[in-house]
């Protein structure tokens, strides 16, 4: 019987699931926008949001906890140096999940996961042509 077991199984064993979400959180912190299936996106919130909350108070102990969960020094650095200060005044809800249709191959529901309040991409300025 499956009583009080929280979380989605996603047809994977526990080590595969753990590695998959570790990679997804790393990609999310690095790129601030990823595309994945809707069930994975909803489950990703359970892994990413506590890490961002942890990064709001910068300490050696918190950095070690984040490194134990992510295993990537550059990602932990960005988490504590950029994302923690960015979300200092926000009490939660750091991710936005936007549905984006269905995948072509198997019609799986897809979604974008992005960090709220991420800076807009900088557009290249037009180059003036020099007419002599």
UniProtKB/Swiss-Prot annotation:
SUPFAM superfamilies: Prokaryotic ribosomal protein L17 (SSF64263)
Signal peptide positions (record): none
Keyword Ribonucleoprotein: yes
Keywords per UniProt: Ribonucleoprotein, Ribosomal protein
Gene3D superfamilies linked to this entry: Ribosomal protein L17
Recorded GO MF terms: structural constituent of ribosome
Subunit structure: Part of the 50S ribosomal subunit. Contacts protein L32.
Entry similarity comment: Belongs to the bacterial ribosomal protein bL17 family.
Protein name, per record: Large ribosomal subunit protein bL17
